[in-house]
């Protein structure tokens, strides 16, 4: 399956925040057919996938969230010309497609690589499953570097943390708060 086909496959599986179970199940099932360095470990609606081991170099983790912002106006997932349109196509399913492509490609990178697919990033910090996954998975405590494949204008950017809790009402089209344009 090409990278674009994998992205379309992911985008056809709805996964608005709080409804990641089907996508988590389908990604787990797809990865169960791949030669992995160990068993897939599940925590709630999140999975940790040991892809490669034994290279003696750095242990790298790639992370991406399974949930997307809930939308009602995007229409079905589709390819038009050289573009793919769907809820979550850029944030975050493009990163997930890359992770699946790495797993399914027989030419693996020469490093110890772990993939982390986690739930509930798009909502309140208290519900985000990444923290509990990092706390519960003993192997993730020893990674050399972790990269969140969150889109950031195609540039490597330092992450930020923090939260603001408020109630607000807006009218208009759904947009991601980091890039509302």
Please tell me what each predicted stretch does.
Residues 1-13, 160-162:
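N-terminal hydrophobic or amphipathic helices/low-complexity stretches enriched
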Residues 6-9, 15-57, 77-78:
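A non-catalytic alpha/beta surface segment that caps or lines the substrate-entry region
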Residues 14, 31, 62-65, 99, ...:
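Buried hydrophobic positions in well-ordered alpha/beta secondary-structure cores of metabolic enzymes
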Residues 51, 170-172:
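Short beta-strand-to-loop capping motifs
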Residues 58-117, 125, 139:
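Active-site metal-coordination/substrate-binding segment of hydrolases
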Residues 65-69, 152, 173:
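Short glycine-rich anion-binding loops that position phosphate/pyrophosphate groups of nucleotides
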Residues 97-165:
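Acidic/histidine-rich catalytic neighborhood of metal-dependent amide-processing enzymes
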Residues 178-181:
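Acidic-enriched catalytic cores of C-N bond-cleaving enzymes acting on peptides and small amides
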């Amino acid at each position: 399956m090409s990278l674009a086909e994998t992205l379309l496959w992911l985008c056809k599986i709805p996964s608005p925040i709080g409804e990641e179970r089907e996508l988590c199940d389908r990604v787990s099932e797809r990865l169960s057919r791949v030669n992995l360095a160990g068993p897939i470990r599940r925590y709630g609606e999140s999975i940790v996938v040991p892809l490669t081991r034994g290279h003696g170099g750095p242990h790298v983790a790639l992370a991406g969230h399974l949930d997307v912002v809930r939308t009602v106006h995007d229409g079905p997932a589709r390819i038009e010309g050289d573009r793919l349109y769907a809820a979550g196509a850029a944030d975050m399913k493009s990163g997930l497609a890359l992770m699946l492509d790495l797993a399914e490609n027989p030419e693996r990178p020469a490093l110890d690589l772990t993939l982390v697919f986690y739930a509930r990033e798009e909502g309140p910090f208290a519900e985000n499953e990444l923290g509990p996954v990092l706390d519960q998975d003993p192997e993730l405590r020893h990674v050399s570097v972790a990269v969140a494949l969150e889109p950031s204008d195609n540039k490597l950017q330092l992450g930020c943390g923090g939260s603001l809790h408020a109630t607000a009402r807006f009218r208009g089209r759904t947009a991601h708060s980091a890039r509302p344009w």
